[in-house]
């Protein structure tokens, strides 16, 4: 088929994007709900180069390729999406809000951007209602040590799920330490110009405010075990 005929079917730039060796794995990651930030240099540069054409490509599946103000990319499904999806749990989203709060904190710079799972858990208990958190784990929770242990395990699971979405990077093979990416702004408060974003995020957490429906994070329906384990740093 001549190049002229190809252009009648699809733009040459889109054909180049689909033929690029980066595309298959990147496409799979985006469809799984992963956010692609500046840390993923090659993938991010690829999306920057072909954004206009890939937006048209994904529109055929009734999803939008979004570039957030912070620079990261993700797919936002419409109600008629052809890509399977599921919504994050309430605890997953609460952990995401805490991560966003930590991202905005002075401690991020002091710690070179590295936090521990224990720091995440402690901040969660400081800012959120512990009784409500325990109810997310066990609706009949009495506040026992067993329930608290289960909550901590669930928080670890939520953190790992958010890692698979590109929200955090584990430090090498040490899953107890992680670095937060700008993608956590998916969980950020919508603040007016002049507001303190960290204080707005604190209110969002304490008030238990739900995220707007259009900002709900979507996952595909595959199990975590089937997801690529790519969220690590050396």
Swiss-Prot record:
**Disordered: annotated span:** 207-234
User: What's a single GO CC term here?
Assistant: nucleoid
Record carries keyword Repeat: no
Q: Which UniProt keywords apply?
A: Cell cycle, Cell division, Chromosome partition, Cytoplasm, DNA condensation
The places in or outside the cell where this protein is found are: Cytoplasm, Nucleoid
User: What segments bear the compositional bias annotation Acidic residues?
Assistant: 221-234
Which Pfam families does its entry note? MukE
Annotated GO biological process: cell division; chromosome condensation; chromosome segregation; DNA replication
> Coiled-coil intervals in this record?
none
Q: What does this protein do?
A: Involved in chromosome condensation, segregation and cell cycle progression. May participate in facilitating chromosome segregation by condensation DNA from both sides of a centrally located replisome during cell division. Probably acts via its interaction with MukB and MukF.
Q: Provide the assembly information.
A: Forms a hexameric complex with MukF, (MukF-(MukE)2)2, which forms a ternary complex with MukB. The complex formation is stimulated by calcium or magnesium.
Instruction: Family membership, please give it.
Output: Belongs to the MukE family.
**NCBIfam families given for it?**
PRK05256.1 (NF003602)
**Protein name as annotated:** Chromosome partition protein MukE
Identify the species of origin.
Answer: Escherichia coli (strain K12)
The taxonomy runs: Bacteria, Pseudomonadati, Pseudomonadota, Gammaproteobacteria, Enterobacterales
């Amino acid at each position: 088929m001549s190049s002229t005929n190809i252009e009648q079917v699809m733009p040459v730039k889109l054909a180049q994007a689909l033929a690029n060796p980066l595309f298959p794995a990147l496409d799979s990651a985006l469809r799984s709900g992963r956010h692609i930030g500046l840390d993923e240099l090659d993938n991010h540069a690829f999306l920057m180069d072909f954004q206009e054409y890939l937006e048209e490509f994904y529109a055929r599946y009734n999803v939008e390729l979004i570039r957030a103000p912070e620079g990261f990319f993700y797919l936002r499904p419409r109600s008629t999406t052809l890509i399977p999806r599921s919504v994050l749990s309430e605890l997953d989203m609460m952990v995401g809000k805490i991560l966003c709060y930590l991202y905005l904190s002075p401690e991020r710079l002091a710690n070179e951007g590295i936090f521990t799972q224990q720091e995440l858990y402690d901040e969660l208990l400081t800012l959120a209602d512990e009784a409500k958190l325990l109810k997310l784990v066990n609706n009949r929770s009495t506040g026992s040590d067993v329930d608290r242990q289960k909550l901590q395990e669930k928080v670890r699971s939520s953190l790992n799920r958010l890692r698979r979405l590109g929200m955090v990077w584990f430090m090498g093979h040490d899953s107890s330490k992680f670095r937060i990416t700008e993608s956590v702004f998916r969980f950020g408060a919508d603040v007016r110009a002049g507001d303190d974003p960290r204080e707005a995020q604190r209110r969002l957490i304490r008030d238990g405010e739900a995220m707007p429906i259009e900002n709900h994070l979507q996952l595909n329906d595959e199990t975590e075990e089937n997801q690529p384990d790519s969220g690590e740093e050396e």
